[in-house]
Regions:
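Glycine-rich anion-binding surface patch
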Residues: 1-134
Length: 134
């Protein structure tokens, strides 16, 4: 797991996004663990305690980061026949670095939008991740 590849922050998802968030948040003890099964190998981001780190899907982990980084989450607007409809897609706004702003593209969940915004605030539009995660 030594080869790294550049990935657009806007395209990060799953374990790749979780690892990038862990690095952006300064969780220096986080590590990428291969899980080998007879049919395939997959990866998890873990704390030294063995806790799986999944800020892009776990509100208990991602929620505090939204507060820490002051990420604004906005549902995608829909104007239906009966007025505004509930949206299943979200985007995030984040301000960083003395007033710079980043707005994500629409994402399937609020946590994914927030996590992408946090990664962008720390690393920019691209981030290096292990090639195995692509």
């Amino acid at each position: 797991m030594s080869e790294m590849t550049e990935v657009k922050t806007a395209e990060l998802e799953g374990v790749a996004l979780d690892l990038a968030v862990a690095l952006a948040a300064g969780w220096v003890s986080a590590r990428l663990i291969p899980i080998i099964t007879p049919s395939k190998t997959y990866y998890e981001v873990q704390a030294p305690s063995g806790l799986q780190l999944r800020p892009s899907t776990d509100w208990a982990q991602g929620g505090p980061l939204i507060v820490k980084y002051q990420v604004a989450l906005v549902p995608e607007a829909h104007n239906g026949l009966q007025g505004t409809e509930m949206s299943e897609r979200w985007y995030a706004d984040i301000y960083y670095g003395g007033g710079q702003q980043y707005t994500t593209e629409h994402c399937n969940t609020a946590l994914v939008a927030a996590c992408r915004a946090i990664v962008c605030a720390e690393f920019g539009d691209t981030v290096s991740i292990p090639a195995e995660l692509i």
